[in-house]
């Protein structure tokens, strides 16, 4: 971006800053002091004469109304900068507009129409497997045919065979990025980030090392660089992403377990709409029929007259009927012996009602 700044030294010696050499504005283009009324400043701290700030290709003057790019100490307008340093299609070598969708294969970028097999000219769609050999795209069928011919023909180095056998998966088309502004101190920066594709052998080596130690030290990373052929930065980023994915996965599993436990608890408490304390059923045990407490002996109370009546009834049943008759004398009176027996028997019995005591019969 170009900014216009008022030059205070243009008004003459009105302060101490105009007398100091450090306060003088120096033009980056011609190297002389700027005495103009206005200074054109390019971010962050490059100052120019209005007549010196122009495109190095088309000599178009650059001001605050246009975009200015700086590369290798030269200034360019947007059109020439994109034409010279912008991203180009690896097939047709033409540039991209901001609305174009592109396909990527390693460091190469293609138009959707240019993303085709170089042998059969079949367009590669998202999800198709392809290979990149000598900057040429090959579909899966042509890649297999080429490998068969190569193995049957002249021998080649094992490393070359390994590099050509890896197949890639075509991804969805993405929007091409506009080139970023490059300043003098950021000349070596790339305008795009390229996704690194790993083959099965490299992934197996990295996963084996990760299972043994998720945080390898510098010595282990150097060994992985030699074993996989990847850069140290790619290996470091792969381990960081792997740890992050595993952490997210563990957090998700923990949340699912807690959710299942809470759902199970709620289903127990709210069975048929009732709430209460959860109980745990135990194993069955034998029922103990004993009664707690001290045993008390119960005795039956019988009145004396009831015992006498039972005794009399029992004696009547035991004796014959003729013995129950009272003997009479020939004179018609009771004998003395019988009267005395009755008297003596009544004296030994307890008090009973009068109806139970026999009386002498007068004749």
Swiss-Prot record:
<dbReference type="Pfam" id="PF00046">
    <property type="entry name" value="Homeodomain"/>
</dbReference>
<keyword id="KW-0217">Developmental protein</keyword>
<feature type="compositionally biased region" description="Low complexity">
    <location>
        <begin position="329"/>
        <end position="340"/>
    </location>
</feature>
<keyword id="KW-0371">Homeobox</keyword>
<dbReference type="GO" id="GO:0046872">
    <property type="term" value="F:metal ion binding"/>
</dbReference>
<dbReference type="Pfam" id="PF00412">
    <property type="entry name" value="LIM"/>
</dbReference>
<keyword id="KW-0238">DNA-binding</keyword>
<keyword id="KW-0479">Metal-binding</keyword>
<dbReference type="GO" id="GO:0007409">
    <property type="term" value="P:axonogenesis"/>
</dbReference>
<dbReference type="GO" id="GO:0005634">
    <property type="term" value="C:nucleus"/>
</dbReference>
<keyword id="KW-0440">LIM domain</keyword>
<dbReference type="InterPro" id="IPR001781">
    <property type="entry name" value="Znf_LIM"/>
</dbReference>
<dbReference type="InterPro" id="IPR017970">
    <property type="entry name" value="Homeobox_CS"/>
</dbReference>
<dbReference type="GO" id="GO:0000987">
    <property type="term" value="F:cis-regulatory region sequence-specific DNA binding"/>
</dbReference>
<feature type="region of interest" description="Disordered">
    <location>
        <begin position="328"/>
        <end position="363"/>
    </location>
</feature>
<dbReference type="InterPro" id="IPR047169">
    <property type="entry name" value="ISL1/2-like"/>
</dbReference>
<feature type="domain" description="LIM zinc-binding 1">
    <location>
        <begin position="27"/>
        <end position="80"/>
    </location>
</feature>
<keyword id="KW-0539">Nucleus</keyword>
<comment type="function">
    <text>Binds to one of the cis-acting domain of the insulin gene enhancer. May be involved in subtype specialization of primary motoneurons.</text>
</comment>
<dbReference type="GO" id="GO:0048665">
    <property type="term" value="P:neuron fate specification"/>
</dbReference>
<protein>
    <recommendedName>
        <fullName>Insulin gene enhancer protein ISL-3</fullName>
    </recommendedName>
</protein>
<feature type="compositionally biased region" description="Polar residues">
    <location>
        <begin position="341"/>
        <end position="363"/>
    </location>
</feature>
<keyword id="KW-0862">Zinc</keyword>
<dbReference type="InterPro" id="IPR047244">
    <property type="entry name" value="ISL1/2-like_LIM1"/>
</dbReference>
<dbReference type="GO" id="GO:0000981">
    <property type="term" value="F:DNA-binding transcription factor activity, RNA polymerase II-specific"/>
</dbReference>
<keyword id="KW-0677">Repeat</keyword>
<dbReference type="InterPro" id="IPR001356">
    <property type="entry name" value="HD"/>
</dbReference>
<feature type="domain" description="LIM zinc-binding 2">
    <location>
        <begin position="89"/>
        <end position="143"/>
    </location>
</feature>
<dbReference type="GO" id="GO:0045944">
    <property type="term" value="P:positive regulation of transcription by RNA polymerase II"/>
</dbReference>
<dbReference type="InterPro" id="IPR009057">
    <property type="entry name" value="Homeodomain-like_sf"/>
</dbReference>
<feature type="DNA-binding region" description="Homeobox">
    <location>
        <begin position="191"/>
        <end position="250"/>
    </location>
</feature>
């Amino acid at each position: 971006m170009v900014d216009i700044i008022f030059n205070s030294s243009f008004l003459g010696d009105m302060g101490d800053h105009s007398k100091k050499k450090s306060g003088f504005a120096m033009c980056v283009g011609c190297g002389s002091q700027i005495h103009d009324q206005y200074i054109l400043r390019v971010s962050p701290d490059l100052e120019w004469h209005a007549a010196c700030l122009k495109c190095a290709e088309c000599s178009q003057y650059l001001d605050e109304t246009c975009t200015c790019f700086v590369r290798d100490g030269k200034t360019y307008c947007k059109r020439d900068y994109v034409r010279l340093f912008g991203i180009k299609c690896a097939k047709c070598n033409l540039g991209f507009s901001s609305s174009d969708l592109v396909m990527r294969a390693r460091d190469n970028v293609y138009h959707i129409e240019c993303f085709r097999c170089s042998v059969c000219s079949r367009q590669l769609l998202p999800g198709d497997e392809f290979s990149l050999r000598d900057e040429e795209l090959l579909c899966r069928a042509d890649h297999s045919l080429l490998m068969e011919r190569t193995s049957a023909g002249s021998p080649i180095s094992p490393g070359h065979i390994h590099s050509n056998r890896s197949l890639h998966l075509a991804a969805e088309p993405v929007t091409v990025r506009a080139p970023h502004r490059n300043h003098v101190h950021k000349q070596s920066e790339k305008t795009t980030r390229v996704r690194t594709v790993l083959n099965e052998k490299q992934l197996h080596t990295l996963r084996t090392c990760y299972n043994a130690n998720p945080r390898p030290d510098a010595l282990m990373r150097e060994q992985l660089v030699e074993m996989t052929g990847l850069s140290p930065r790619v290996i470091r980023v792969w381990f960081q992403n792997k740890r992050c994915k595993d952490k997210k996965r563990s957090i998700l599993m923990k949340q699912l377990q807690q959710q299942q436990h809470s759902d199970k608890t709620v289903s127990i408490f709210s069975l048929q709409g009732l709430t209460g304390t959860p109980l745990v059923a135990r194993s069955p045990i034998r029922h103990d029929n004993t009664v707690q407490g001290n045993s008390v002996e119960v005795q039956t109370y019988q009145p004396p007259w009831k015992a006498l009546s039972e005794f009399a009834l029992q004696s009547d049943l035991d004796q014959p009927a003729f013995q129950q008759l009272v003997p009479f004398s020939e004179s018609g009176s009771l004998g003395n012996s019988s009267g005395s027996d009755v008297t003596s028997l009544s004296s030994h019995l307890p008090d009973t009602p009068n109806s139970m005591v026999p009386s002498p019969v007068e004749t």
